[in-house]
């Protein structure tokens, strides 16, 4: 297991595996409003996937793992998108700050993330160990 990190596996496979792990573990609590909320002003509908909250949490955990520290504002920019304005030129709209904030708070509550002294969040030692363990299991399954 030494030397295996999240960078060594495919992003989509890792996100799906970690989302399944988060759902299976049952430690992460989801808000009641996740089935009706949009993920940003640029979206017209709520997500179709009933497990989208776990997938978003896994993607955010991977995103923060690959960087030193990330704030909620940066996550809003990452998960934003282009707004449909008809014939007019499209513009970027940030994703929902509430969704990103609640996901980060959920990950912080289960010990994957911790607050950084410089602002934002960073991956904790326990979180890094969990993510590396998932990455190692994916590499084992591949071989």
Curated annotation (Swiss-Prot):
The keyword Ribonucleoprotein applies. PROSITE patterns: RIBOSOMAL_S19E (PS00628). GO terms for biological process: cytoplasmic translation; ribosomal small subunit assembly. GO terms for cellular component: cytosol; cytosolic small ribosomal subunit; nucleus. It comes from the Eukaryota. It is found in: Cytoplasm; Nucleus. Keywords: Cytoplasm, Nucleus, Ribonucleoprotein, Ribosomal protein. InterPro entries: Ribosomal_eS19, Ribosomal_eS19_CS, WH-like_DNA-bd_sf, WH_DNA-bd_sf. Belongs to the eukaryotic ribosomal protein eS19 family. Component of the small ribosomal subunit (SSU). Mature yeast ribosomes consist of a small (40S) and a large (60S) subunit. The 40S small subunit contains 1 molecule of ribosomal RNA (18S rRNA) and at least 33 different proteins. The large 60S subunit contains 3 rRNA molecules (25S, 5.8S and 5S rRNA) and at least 46 different proteins. There are 2 genes for eS19 in S.pombe. This is Small ribosomal subunit protein eS19B. It comes from Schizosaccharomyces pombe (strain 972 / ATCC 24843) (Fission yeast).
């Amino acid at each position: 297991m030494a030397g295996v990190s999240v960078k060594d596996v495919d992003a989509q496979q890792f996100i799906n595996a970690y989302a399944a792990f988060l759902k299976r573990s049952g430690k992460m609590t989801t808000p009641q409003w996740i089935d009706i909320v949009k993920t940003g002003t640029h979206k017209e509908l709520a997500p179709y996937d009933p497990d989208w909250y776990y997938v978003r949490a896994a993607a955010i955990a991977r995103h923060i793992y690959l960087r030193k520290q990330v704030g909620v504002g940066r996550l809003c920019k990452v998960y934003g998108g282009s707004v449909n304005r008809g014939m007019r030129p499209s513009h970027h709209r940030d994703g929902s700050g509430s969704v990103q904030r609640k996901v980060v708070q959920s990950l912080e509550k289960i010990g994957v993330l911790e607050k950084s002294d410089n602002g934002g969040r960073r991956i904790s030692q326990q979180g890094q160990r969990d993510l590396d363990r998932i990455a190692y299991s994916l590499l084992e399954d591949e071989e």
